[in-house]
Amino acid sequence: MKKHIIINLSIAIVVAVMASCQPRNKDTQAVSTEQKETANNQPIQPADSGYADVNGLKMYYEVYGEGKPIVLLHGSFMNIPLNWSHIIPVFAKNRKVIVAEMQGHGRTKDIPREFSYENMADDVSGLLKHLKIDSADILGYSMGGGVAFQFAVRHPEQLRRLVILSGTYKHDGWWPDVEASFATMNADMFKGSPIEKQYDSLGNDPKNFPAYVKKVLSIDVKPYDWSKEVKNIKAPVFIAIGDADGVQYEHALELFRAKGGGKMGDIHGLPKSRLAIIPGTTHIGMMQHMDWIIPMVNDFLDSDLKPTPPTF
């Protein structure tokens, strides 16, 4: 049974990544005309790109657009084009979008240090200092959500608002079968996938791919629990998961309650933090439903977050 689950998880990753590399005509049907045009455009060119020397890494980054800065943090095994190619143009219409490839991912070569959420959060902090950005909104997806949580805990002075898409702040925030699958996944499951092909095409030695997969997976086989620290984050938090996600509902609800949720807003006022459970959406499918999610994110980031609820 476990083997069956793991194989299905691997297939889902490959299929979803392949889909993310293709134009999403079906997905863009529900978006506004403006977003349709953006999503169907050719990828826009960065205003700035390069490598930042941070904590021993040469961290690859790209910057798009103008306005309030938002940093997008990718998921495991991903890179800028795989995770964000259809999303950057939409956010860049009104924001300065900073995207980077974290330790060992994409064009950021690995170094001999522990692969950890804490280290990668410190790298993001260093990148913002390199770019001379005092503070930013942070959006993290999956593994990037864990990095975003740690960024909020370790570098609160650099954070304005926090957006978590399908991320966890403790290891048992995943459904048990998902958590169990991490220990038995391996490089063979990605054979011939866009993940393997992009790893090779971005200047990495193909012989190192199995070691890369093992190191990335190491972050999820070690127990972690930042519940206390995360619940004390002062910045407003928007957490979104799919209703068929790998993240447990109660995990997201626990944080939302700690941030003032779980009460009727018409009586007690609206909390500054927000929660969304996206219907008909898997963990990987979150990236295919960004036409629903981006308007929610923009509203959260642009709102004055006053507690007064709307009236008739």
Question: Which role fits each region the language model picked out?
Answer:
Residues 17-20:
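C-terminal motif of bacterial Sec signal peptides marking the signal peptidase cleavage site
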Residues 57-109:
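Conserved HGGG/HGGXW glycine-rich cap/lid loop of the alpha/beta-hydrolase fold
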Residues 99-139:
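Active-site loop/oxyanion-hole signature of alpha/beta-hydrolase fold enzymes
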Residues 146-154, 160-196:
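Flexible "cap/lid" loop of the alpha/beta hydrolase fold
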Residues 213-229:
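Active-site nucleophile elbow and catalytic-triad environment of alpha/beta-hydrolase enzymes
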Residues 233, 239-241:
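Short beta-strand/loop motif that positions the catalytic acidic residue
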Residues 246-254, 286:
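Conserved alpha/beta-hydrolase "acid-adjacent" motif
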Residues 271-312:
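Catalytic active-site module of serine/aspartate enzymes centered on a nucleophile-bearing elbow/loop
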